[in-house]
């Protein structure tokens, strides 16, 4: 029997994502000037205020206020009527030195024996239902908001958009788990107060259905067949959405972990990513398991896979590695046997994850909105500034965990 599955996304202007982006901008700046920085940074944003708190061990000093303001400005909170504006918001920093008790569990005389920064379990997932090996409902949810942000910045076809927005896509699947069509789309977008409420809501719905949706179909032609005139659209279903962003809802780092990962498919160990340097396995091991999952599916080992890894704080070797293929395995091995091969191919000690995926680089700001997974690897040049006139220009590789660079190794190991 056919069934429905739903995933959601939030825009870069959503208050929780504003917090994530500030936290990750701080991570990038610390790593740019001191690649061995240990950082855990949490951000709270609310009406006219930003509060930074966390623990740092680093040889660099940063102007954290300026970094936060630049992030807020880039997102688009640049007008006083938003009640949260880059130049005027207050910024309080309570960032302090990392606990020596925690640091002793990570630092080792031998780099290779670097301990995990915490206990916990992390998951990576991949499926062949999309070209980027991501769940389709989440991919579409992200795509809607990326294009909505493009429309906002162009300020041409739609002129009233504000930064805060959410999306949700419901797909109908067939008995054999193949996506058939889009059943429902929900979009809530913040907007200017430009007319009577009923008039505004009617125009917003008309504009999104007649402008945004055709742009999505043109930009993602592989999804065009899923759109038809039977889709139920819920556009700003609660009514007008003028008050939004951090003024409408307080935002916190790490509150959108399902949006960040697989949209409810697979599993999640509970640890957030943003604001954490790669010694925190919540982040680095989640990237590493995604890398494993994607390469196994791309190699033809299975159609769908979930990879779990777990750690004890201060211990380098994982306490477990487990694989679930949901009955889609193409090789004559049990999931337990596949797990053993994965363990032999991929060294999951924290230092080796950092080296394999080049994680001690300032690569995290780009992850903090529209998902950490399913993105396109690319090499970019970035320039950072610090007090005293210091600048640092670096070339870095983004989204290394999305590379299909182990496909041949996997095929050889599995004899295919």
Curated annotation (Swiss-Prot):
K(+) binds at residue 42. The gene is metK. Residues 98-108 are annotated as: Flexible loop. ATP binds at residues 14, 164-166, 240-241, 249, 255-256, 272, 276. GO terms for cellular component: cytoplasm. The lineage of its organism: Bacteria, Pseudomonadati, Bacteroidota, Flavobacteriia, Flavobacteriales. This is S-adenosylmethionine synthase. Pathway: Amino-acid biosynthesis; S-adenosyl-L-methionine biosynthesis; S-adenosyl-L-methionine from L-methionine: step 1/1. PANTHER family: S-ADENOSYLMETHIONINE SYNTHETASE. InterPro entries: ADOMET_SYNTHASE_CS (IPR022631), S-AdoMet_synt_C (IPR022630), S-AdoMet_synt_central (IPR022629), S-AdoMet_synt_N (IPR022628), S-AdoMet_synthetase (IPR002133), S-AdoMet_synthetase_sfam (IPR022636). One of its GO terms (biological process) is one-carbon metabolic process. Keywords: ATP-binding, Cytoplasm, Magnesium, Metal-binding, Nucleotide-binding, One-carbon metabolism, Potassium, Transferase. Its EC number is 2.5.1.6. Belongs to the AdoMet synthase family. It comes from Flavobacterium psychrophilum (strain ATCC 49511 / DSM 21280 / CIP 103535 / JIP02/86).
